[in-house]
Every structure is written in structure tokens, then in C-alpha cells.
A protein has these predicted regions:
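Structural motif
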Residues: 326-340, 347-352, 382-390
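Short helix-capping/linker segments at secondary-structure and domain boundaries
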Residues: 347-361, 402-407
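N-terminal export and membrane-targeting signals
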Residues: 1-17, 238-239
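Flexible "cap/lid" loop of the alpha/beta hydrolase fold
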Residues: 270-288, 358-361, 368-382
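Gly/Pro-rich cap/lid or specificity-loop segments adjacent to the active site
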Residues: 49-338, 394, 400-522
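Bacterial signal peptide processing site
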Residues: 27-30
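C-terminal motif of bacterial Sec signal peptides marking the signal peptidase cleavage site
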Residues: 21-25
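Long, low-complexity segments enriched in small/aliphatic residues
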Residues: 369-400, 404-405
Length: 522
């Protein structure tokens, strides 16, 4: 079993993901509660001439909002340390209160939502992140440093920590031993007794600790939180960016509140057409493709620390750890399960790839500290943020009704080993984690967004968290989806692909909708 490790500089910046499948009226509206261009480091050519769309609502200067912002510049920089953000950025924070609205107590209870504001623009632009990535406030702070200046001259980014994450009444209910067992588990072991036991205990402890909160952590109620924030900001329509699984919150919002949708960018949307097994299988395929891109990138840099065959180096490391876990300085161990979860996490952020290659090589040489640090935020959290696994489990299991028996999961592991030799077992095992959790009464509705303005979707070809086909199928299902395909790698295109970022800039700032579809090369 691996003891929580101390985070390195690397782990703070990594988008860590466990293999869990998981203009109407003149005033602020009430809630309804009960194309080919060069991208990356190559200078981008102009995308295909976009079409001016009168269907996109104008940007709003908000009426007087009800949010009292206070300076949080120092604490934000401390939370992101050792990441250095430009001194020109300043950060303000606030809290707003939304209804908890548990299924067992509709309309009752409260949840406090943590917000962060960065940018000097008059129009608020809400930012919603993955459950298993940085809290939305910190993701917005990092995103502000990656976007062209025009974004922050037009908008103030408003990062929102989703209920149960970051500073929004964070969930911290999974016993440490269970958390470690889930992350450490041997991805080749089809005897799932230990993993099932940890999942069962985790679900029981969270249900006891959270009580009525447990069932109130889901996408639909988070969409209600978005409308609460919209009202508090003083706008009739909310402009927003959803990253990864955070995109699903915005499609749910578009279905529930189409008249309050402004300009929305969904960067890496989950596939709404797949069940849990289909999602895990798509992720396994995408993770394999992303690792291939990572290996090619390593070799293209010269003197790749993983040698001429990075996949073989990783396989050798995993085989070694399967029988001889590496001791860590804090008394813990690096197992093959922890190592593979760490690699999956590191693949998500392309800027971390050089450090990931070095970490794998050092682990292969007997020093696993840097590789273990990639899963630190999942297992141990940080001094200011709880472990991410807890909210990811609770919310993820509330969003899907599929529950697989251990025998089904073991059979799936065997079936996927040939097609997905690195990540098939790990992603198949993830299908067991929701088994002990209560099944939600209603499935998550398929997104339609009927009556909403055009919604821009950014797809990344090799995305190990939300595979590119998810954005493509979401665009097909939405009444007004417009797709930009980036043929690159990593989790999300915004701020990573110059082409996709430019398309989003034209859409958000100028109100121009790109050709559908538009393709951006790597």
C-alpha cells in the first residue's frame, strides 16, 4: 500500500485524473428551481472565414451584482506554488450560497460556492473545470495566464469550485487506506476482492459522513449552481467555458436554462452516447494513442530519457513494480498501479510531458518520488485542497446508473488486454468503483440545448481524459453545436492549440462562429 506522498512542483500543475468513469426581459432572469490551420508552437494561419451569426447574443455589461469580491492574490499564488503566474494578473475571491437541493430534501439546505475573478474586462466569463482536475478557481487562474491578452481585456474570468471540490464545501470522506488501495491496485489482477472492499468501505463512509449531501453532488445540481452564480453576477445570459467533464455541466445548463445561455465554449466534452463501459473503453484507446504521441514527442526532443522504445521502458517498470514496489522517502511505496495512474495523469497536460519522461526514467532506475507525485492530489490532496478522489467518486457515481459485478469487470479486463496493453486493465477496473454506491433514480439526460445559441465545442484527437469523439458526438446531439477538431494531444485545446484558441477568441469576443467543422492540425 502506498502512503500519501508529498507533492513536488510537478504535481501541483498536473491535471490529475484517476481512472474513474465516472436575452429575455430587461432584468436578471429568475432561476427555474422547484477550415485547416497550423497550431501549437508553429505560427497559426487564419482559420477558414467564420460566419457572422446574429444568433449569438451580445456580450453583457452586468447590472450591479450581489457578489462582494475581496483580494485573494497572495493566497491564490500560494495555492498554485511553485507555479509562477504573471505579476500583471490580480485575483479576487468571493463566496455565494446555492441550494443544496438533495433528492431527499428538495429545495432545502445550502452549499457555499467558492469563486475567483481574474481579468479587467467588464463581461464575466464563467470557468467550470473537471471534477478530478484543479478546482475551478485555480484552473481559471492558470487559464488566465495561457490566454491571449484580448480575453482578459474583454472578460473577467470567474472560476467556480464545483460543489464538493476546492473551497465549495469540499468532500473529504474516503478513508485514507481505501483511497490508497484504489490508486495502488494492480491493474493486471483480475482478483478484485481488495478493490471491491475498498470501494465498498469508501461508499459506506461517504454516505454516513455526507448524509443528505451525498446524493446532492451531481451534474444537474451543479448546473443549478451555475444559474445561481449567473444571478449573483447580474447578467441575463451567462458566457462560459467548460473544460473536460465540466463541459457536461454547461450542456445540462443549456438544456435547463436555454434562455440564459450566452456564448459557451466546451473544451473536451464527455461522450453523451456511451454507457460507463463505453466511456472506459474510449478512454483506454485514447490513453494508448496519447502515450504513443508522448513517446514520439520524447524521441523528437533528442536524448529521450526513456530510450528508443518508451513503451518497453514503461512496461519493464510496471513489471518490476508488480513484484517489487519501490520504497519512497516518506515511508510509502510506488506500486505498478500507482505508477500507471501517475502516467495517465501526466499524459493529460502536454507541458508536463518532459517531466513525465524524466519521472518514468528515474522510477525505472529506482527513484519513484517524482512519478508518485503525479497522483499526490488524488491520494493526499494538498495543504489547502482535499484529495480529489472523494468528490470524483461521489459525483461521478451519482451521474451514472451502470453498476458492474466483479465478474463482469474481470472479463472486461481480459478482453481489453490485447487491444489496450498499457491502460486497458486500469480503465476496466475503474468500472468496479461505483458498484457499491446507490443508483440514482434518473439517468443524466442527453444534451440537446434546444433554443440555445450556437455552442462551440473543441475536440482534441488524443485526449486521455475526455476523448475527442466525445466532443464530436456532443456537437451532433446539440441543436446548435459547432465543432473545432484539433489533431493534437493532451486534455483540452484551449490555451494549447493556437488555432483552437483563436477560434474560441473570435467566437467569444467577436461573436463569429467558425465553419462547422473546422480542423486544426497538431
Amino acid at each position: 500500500m502506498v502512503t500519501p506522498v508529498r507533492l513536488s512542483a510537478l504535481a501541483v500543475t498536473t491535471t490529475v485524473t484517476l481512472a474513474l468513469v465516472l436575452l429575455v426581459g430587461c432584468t436578471v432572469g429568475p432561476s427555474q428551481r422547484p477550415g485547416l490551420v497550423v497550431a501549437g508552437s508553429v505560427p497559426a494561419q487564419a482559420p477558414p472565414p467564420p460566419t457572422k451569426s446574429s444568433a449569438l447574443p451580445p456580450l453583457e455589461r452586468p447590472a450591479q451584482g450581489a457578489i462582494g469580491w475581496t483580494d485573494c492574490d497572495t493566497v491564490t499564488r500560494q495555492r498554485l506554488s511553485p507555479v509562477t503566474l504573471p505579476p500583471t494578473l490580480t485575483f479576487q475571491c468571493a463566496r455565494v450560497v446555492s441550494a443544496l437541493d438533495s433528492p431527499s430534501a428538495p429545495g432545502e439546505g445550502l452549499v457555499r460556492l467558492q469563486l475567483l475573478k481574474v481579468g479587467q474586462g467588464p463581461t464575466p466569463l464563467l470557468v467550470v473545470n473537471d471534477l478530478n482536475g484543479l478546482p475551478g478557481t485555480l484552473y481559471a487562474a492558470e487559464l488566465a495566464a495561457q490566454l491571449p491578452p484580448a480575453f482578459l481585456n474583454t472578460f473577467s474570468l470567474i472560476g467556480m469550485d464545483r460543489r464538493g471540490t476546492g473551497g465549495s464545501d469540499p468532500v473529504h470522506c474516503v478513508p485514507a487506506a481505501d483511497r490508497e488501495q484504489i490508486v495502488d491496485y494492480d491493474p493486471t489482477d483480475t482478483d478484485l476482492t481488495g478493490l471491491l472492499g475498498a470501494s465498498l468501505d469508501a461508499s459506506q463512509q461517504c454516505i454516513l459522513a455526507l448524509d443528505t449531501r451525498s446524493a446532492a453532488l451531481d451534474t444537474q445540481r451543479t448546473a443549478e449552481d451555475v444559474d445561481t452564480v449567473r444571478q449573483q453576477l447580474g447578467v441575463r445570459r451567462i458566457d462560459a467555458i467548460g473544460h473536460g467533464e465540466g463541459s457536461r455541466v454547461l450542456t445540462a445548463y443549456a438544456d435547463r436554462f436555454p434562455g440564459h445561455v450566452g456564448r459557451m465554449v466546451l473544451d473536451g466534452s464527455p461522450d453523451p452516447t456511451l454507457d460507463a463501459t463505453g466511456v472506459a473503453k474510449a478512454r483506454a484507446a485514447a490513453a494508448e494513442a496519447t502515450f504513443t504521441a508522448f513517446a514520439s514527442d520524447c524521441q523528437s526532443r533528442g536524448a529521450c530519457p526513456l530510450g528508443g522504445a518508451p513503451d518497453s521502458t514503461l512496461e519493464q517498470l510496471l513489471a518490476q513494480l508488480r513484484t517489487r514496489p519501490e520504497p519512497l522517502a516518506d515511508g510509502g511505496q510506488l506500486t505498478n498501479g500507482t505508477a500507471l495512474n501517475a502516467v495517465l495523469a501526466g499524459l493529460a497536460d502536454r507541458s508536463d510531458w518532459p517531466a513525465l519522461a524524466t519521472a518514468i526514467a528515474r522510477a525505472h532506475g529506482g527513484d519513484g518520488a517524482e512519478l508518485a507525485a503525479f497522483v499526490g492530489p488524488v491520494v493526499a490532496g494538498t495543504a489547502t485542497d482535499p484529495p480529489r478522489l472523494d468528490a470524483d467518486l461521489a459525483s461521478g457515481c451519482n451521474d451514472q446508473q451502470d453498476r458492474l459485478a466483479p465478474a463482469q469487470v474481470a472479463a472486461t479486463m481480459k478482453a481489453w488486454t490485447g487491444a489496450f496493453p498499457l491502460f486497458g486493465g486500469l480503465l476496466a477496473q475503474s468500472l468496479l468503483l461505483c458498484g457499491p454506491w446507490p443508483v440514482p433514480d434518473q439517468p443524466l439526460p442527453k444534451p440537446v440545448g434546444k433554443g440555445a445559441p450556437p455552442i462551440l465545442l473543441l475536440s482534441t484527437a488524443n485526449d486521455p481524459v475526455t476523448p475527442g469523439t466525445g466532443s464530436q458526438r456532443t456537437a451532433q446531439q446539440l441543436d446548435s453545436g459547432v465543432l473545432v477538431n484539433w489533431l493534437g494531444s493532451g486534455h483540452g485545446a484551449l490555451g494549447q492549440s493556437a488555432c483552437a484558441t483563436q477560434a474560441a477568441q473570435h467566437y467569444l469576443i467577436n461573436g463569429t462562429v467558425p465553419a462547422n467543422p473546422t480542423t486544426c492540425p497538431p
